[in-house]
Amino acid sequence: MIKLSNITKVFQQGARTIQALNNVSLHVPAGQIYGVIGASGAGKSTLIRCVNLLERPTEGSVQVGGQELTTLSESELTKARRQIGMIFQHFNLLSSRTVFGNVALPLELDNTPKEEIKRRVTELLDLVGLGDKHDSYPANLSGGQKQRVAIARALASNPKVLLCDEATSALDPATTRSILELLKDINRRLGLTILLITHEMDVVKRICDCVAVISNGELIEQDTVSEVFSHPKTPLAQKFIQSTLHLDIPEDYQARLKASPETDSVPMLRMEFTGQSVDAPLLSETARRFNVNNNIISAQMDYAGGVKFGIMLTEMHGTQEETQAAIAWLQDHHVKVEVLGYV
């Protein structure tokens, strides 16, 4: 549905040249929810704005629904953009218009008959859970409700693609979850292709089928969500995954933690489990094989793309030789083990 090929975008600021995107290629199949994640300044917003040519690429090809957009005339591009809805971090609602009026605006600009506008807007407000807010004004809505209005407006022209530019960044966690569930529901009901950009791996984890990691204007990793979470190939992807699972060392352990082993001290380990290592009884196996005892201090488990992954803090009791052998065995079985210190 969306195919970006060898996209390069260069900005000129006086005598300074800024390369925002460098030879980026991305394919989003029809009906998928595809996430692009990266830090601030990585090129995410420039990338998504190239899809509907709000930013015209310096080089490269942009195809949406099989149509090459970069060669279209202005009138042809305007028509093509009706098939591409877009929502933003800031809702951009017209304060002087009601909820109904905001959603109706693109239809009015397209000279849609009034009866058709009424039917379509009513249908969309019901879809986004605002069927009772027809006559409300944006000032009387919560942030989540405003974003729902923006989503309804973006869907007014019955697009095949929805672009989401940091659509949940300005929302609290509970509202973020509700908006993500709404997007997932719309994707299922309408078969809508969704491309979203974010700096939060939690967003990707909750609703995306595939994810690409962008850094310094380049896509450095892209795959299914389950594959990236199970086998991240780049340090940046690993960092984003770690941000979704975070365990603090308890204060009493922190006070006793030493950088080097002492008499009768034991290593404190941080273990990351992904893919098959989550379900395997690996700690029990280390106890049998290496005569070590694992005291679990804290643990957290989650799902992404249908795959479980988790993190654990443990004390490993045993001789130095036994614990080193056990740690090496765990690493051989795809557990990432970090020695945090000794307690």
From Swiss-Prot:
Organism listed in the record: Salmonella choleraesuis (strain SC-B67)
GO cellular component terms listed in the entry, alphabetical order: Gram-negative-bacterium-type cell wall; plasma membrane
List of residues binding ATP: G38, A39, S40, G41, A42, G43, K44, S45
Subcellular localization: Cell inner membrane
Protein name: Methionine import ATP-binding protein MetN 1
PANTHER family, per database record: AMINO ACID IMPORT ATP-BINDING PROTEIN, METHIONINE IMPORT ATP-BINDING PROTEIN METN
Free-text function comment from the UniProt entry: Part of the ABC transporter complex MetNIQ involved in methionine import. Responsible for energy coupling to the transport system.
InterPro entries in the record: AAA+_ATPase, ABC_MetN_proteobac, ABC_transporter-like_ATP-bd, ABC_transporter-like_CS, ACT-like_dom_sf, MetN_ABC, MetN_ABC_transporter-like, NIL_domain
Pfam families with a match to the protein in the record: ABC_tran, NIL
Family note: Belongs to the ABC transporter superfamily. Methionine importer (TC 3.A.1.24) family.
Record key words, sorted: Amino-acid transport, ATP-binding, Cell inner membrane, Cell membrane, Membrane, Nucleotide-binding, Translocase, Transport
UniProt xrefs under SMART domains: AAA (SM00382), NIL (SM00930)
Keyword ATP-binding: yes
Subunit structure: The complex is composed of two ATP-binding proteins (MetN), two transmembrane proteins (MetI) and a solute-binding protein (MetQ).
EC nos: 7.4.2.11
Entry superkingdom: Bacteria
A GO molecular-function descriptor: ATP binding
Catalysed reactions, as listed in the record: L-methionine(out) + ATP + H2O = L-methionine(in) + ADP + phosphate + H(+); D-methionine(out) + ATP + H2O = D-methionine(in) + ADP + phosphate + H(+)
